[in-house]
């Protein structure tokens, strides 16, 4: 595949930041490979030519082109394209696998709930120990939930991360919490990641932290939340306990901010290798004034003196090279809140609306869509 076209090859170049990605600088076609599963992105003519060439050499089991009413499946991800008022929208979901997962867990008739973990109490509601059989079930089920939370369900990332902290010594409360997450999934099987099909690329990066807000599970450690959007679609997210105790909320926010910058850099390196234009500086949205101050003026004499480490110099270099720019966002509109704390159904619904509004605004800006 990487043999030059002059020598009878396809002319693809292998990515240096992700060896599973290939890019053709002439046709602008992009390929993602995972073992024997291949996903190709390009125009119809080049895609057909590519698949015919691969089929002739290796004998493909099957291949499909994503079209209206003809979704494709890649690594259990269902990818669709739909026409909405003259605008093409891409969507990604795992609804079929999630539905089967619920059936396999024997919960096909479970009553749906509107929030996976509306407060912190349920996980601690029953301290009674679990049996060996229940312990095995918890570990297996949380493992499956982690897979879905990582690939297509950012809306359960925090809750799954939280129950994962209890795998060593789970209780009956852990079982209740896991069952509630499944009940939430049962009521949101139609959840999907969406983005309009536009020529340009808009990037949005959000970071947040919850400073020692869950001491029963995380002790004095804070939680970092990061969401990275491409044209309004989440392409990377994580909810993770910070490795060290932060002495203040400012320190926790700065740690989350620097983690977001690091994540963004990796994705931008890959995007640039694949021929995707990246507009600098990277705008990172945070709802903490200390985080904004840290990015704009990393100086030991500032109002947040005493919370720095080596990230100080690193962020200063990125700022001076105009690679990053911190933007203040209203806490009520900070979509990454769902990665750092338990939320009520009302707050969760509002943040999901804010997430979809970003994609709709991008569609309007580029295409005049709705």
Question: Where do the PLM segments sit?
Answer:
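Catalytic palm active-site di-aspartate
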Residues: 14-42, 68-80, 98, 144, ...
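Mobile genetic element proteins and their domesticated derivatives, centered on retroelements
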Residues: 1, 7, 21, 36-38, ...
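Catalytic palm subdomain of template-directed nucleic-acid polymerases
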Residues: 24-59, 77-93, 165-172, 290-304
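C-terminal reverse transcriptase regions that engage the nucleic-acid substrate
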Residues: 69-190, 330, 340
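RNase H-like nuclease fold core
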Residues: 145, 205-252
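RNase H-like nuclease module associated with reverse transcription
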Residues: 166, 202, 243-370
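Active-site palm subdomain of RNA-directed nucleic acid polymerases
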Residues: 1-35, 40-42, 47-51, 57-64, ...
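Structured nucleic-acid-interacting core domains from mobile-element enzymes and related host factors
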Residues: 183-211, 276-278
């Amino acid at each position: 595949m990487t043999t030059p076209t002059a020598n009878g090859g396809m002319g693809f170049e292998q990515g240096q930041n992700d060896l599973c990605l290939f890019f053709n600088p002439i046709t602008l076609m992009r390929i993602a490979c995972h073992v024997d599963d291949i996903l190709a992105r390009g125009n119809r003519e080049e895609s057909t030519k590519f698949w015919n060439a691969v089929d002739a050499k290796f004998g493909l089991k099957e291949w499909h082109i994503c079209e209206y009413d003809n979704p494709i499946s890649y690594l259990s991800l269902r990818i669709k394209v739909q026409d909405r008022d003259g605008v093409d929208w891409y969507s990604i979901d795992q609804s079929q696998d999630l539905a089967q997962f619920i059936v396999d867990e024997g919960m096909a008739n479970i009553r749906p709930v509107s929030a996976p973990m509306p407060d912190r109490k349920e996980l601690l509601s029953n301290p009674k120990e679990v049996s060996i059989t229940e312990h095995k079930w918890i570990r297996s089920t949380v493992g499956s939930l982690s897979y879905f939370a990582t690939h297509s369900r950012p809306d359960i990332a925090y809750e799954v991360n939280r129950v994962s902290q209890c795998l060593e010594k789970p209780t009956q409360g852990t079982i209740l919490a896991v069952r509630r997450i499944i009940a939430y999934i049962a009521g949101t099987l139609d959840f999907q990641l969406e983005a309009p099909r536009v020529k340009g690329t808009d990037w949005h990066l959000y970071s947040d932290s919850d400073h020692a807000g869950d001491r029963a599970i995380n002790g004095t450690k804070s939680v970092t939340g990061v969401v990275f959007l491409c044209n309004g679609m989440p392409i990377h997210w994580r909810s993770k306990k910070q490795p060290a105790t932060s002495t203040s909320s400012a320190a926790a926010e700065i740690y989350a901010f620097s983690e977001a910058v690091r994540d963004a850099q990796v994705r931008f390196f890959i995007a640039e290798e694949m021929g995707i234009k990246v507009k600098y500086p990277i705008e990172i949205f945070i709802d903490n004034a200390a985080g904004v101050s840290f990015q704009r003026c990393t100086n030991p004499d500032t109002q947040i003196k005493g919370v720095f480490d080596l990230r100080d110099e690193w962020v200063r270099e990125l700022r001076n090279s105009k690679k990053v720019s911190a933007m203040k966002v209203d806490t009520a509109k900070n979509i990454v809140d769902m990665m750092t704390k338990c939320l009520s159904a009302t707050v969760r619904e509002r943040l999901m609306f804010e997430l979809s509004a970003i994609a709709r605004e991008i569609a309007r800006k580029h295409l005049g869509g709705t």
